[in-house]
Amino acid sequence: MATCSSDRTIKVFDTGTTTTTTSGDGGGGGENVANPPPPQEAIVERANATTLTGHEGPVWQVSWAHPKFGALLASCSFDHTVMIWKETSSNVFSRVYVTPKGFFDGSVNAISWAPHEFGCAVAACSSDGSVAVISSNSNVAGGGWRSEKISNEAHAVGCTGVSWGQNDEIASCGCDNLCKIWTRGGAQEGGGGGESSNHNQHHHHNQQQQQQQWRLKKELRGHSDWVRDVQWAPNNGGSNVQQIASCSQDGKVFIWTESNNNSSTTTANKDYHSVLLNDFKTAVWRLSWSVVGSVLAVSDANNQVSVWKESVDGAWTQIQSK
């Protein structure tokens, strides 16, 4: 488990669970069947494994890559950088990449890894208004890394949140009261002719580079103040219908659902309609979907976390508050 702090550090905790069981007292009289001893509870041991230093400002977020790529951790900071960390041996992490100086011209506020099937890549957004993708040049984690901007002017005044969806599209939000959806432009097909063995090794990577041409697909308008977070729901039961949750300084949480008003298999011309989950009457900071995308957790400025679930009629109801 990784945590980050305004003290500029990242802490990685190695968690483990051990369970011990009780046995008879060995006194020769047999167990008291009527009043057996209570079972001993599981003991959870948590030890501070390591502290990662290197950021020169508060660290806002950390996020683990898919295990397919090994123990890779991304971090973003007020110091204008994204860093990639790799576990090189047990509880030992090395920094394998940092975005170049000047690549971001403001605090990097949020990061989101791509679903593993789209490669080893993480999206990041900054107070300078830009959205970027940092990706490994191969499917082998720890290989060469590169950074590229999706847009230098994604959100006026600044970008506050980013989420990489399972449809290989990126959602971002910002201080312009908007959520935006970014999709890859069409890549050209590879040329003909004979291919050497070396060409075969790099052909897939070259195709990936061609596909890294992102374009704005949709603007989602509904909030009246800064949008603080946006989160793409995991595909619910394998459904092709896309859902995005957004929350704002205006106190509202919206659920945006891709319209399904035509039979086209492409999403290029589809729109999104919104449903107001709730007006919390205070700023809403963060959102988090359950693994299957059917439950949404919401945290607000009243120090409350509430959990919401969609009913069969499309309305959202609160199921837990803590």
Locate each region found by the language model.
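C-terminal interaction modules of eukaryotic adaptor/scaffold proteins
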Residues: K270-K322
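WD40-repeat beta-propellers
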Residues: I10-D14, V62, V82-E87, I111, ...
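Loop/turn segments within WD40 beta-propeller blades
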Residues: S63-G70, S112-G119, G161-D168, Q231-V241, ...
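Acidic/hydrophobic-patterned starts of short beta strands in beta-sheet-rich repeat architectures
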Residues: M1, A71-L73, C120-A123, I170-A171, ...
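WD40/WD-repeat beta-propeller blade-loop signature
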Residues: N48, P58, F69, S107, ...
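WD40/WD-repeat beta-propeller blade N-cap
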Residues: E45, L52-V59, T99-V108, S151-C159, ...
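Short loop/turn segments immediately following beta-strands, especially the blade-tip
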Residues: D14-Q40, K86-V92, S135-G143, T183-Q201, ...
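Conserved strand-to-loop turn within each blade of WD40 beta-propeller repeats
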Residues: C4-D7, S75-D79, A124-D128, S136, ...
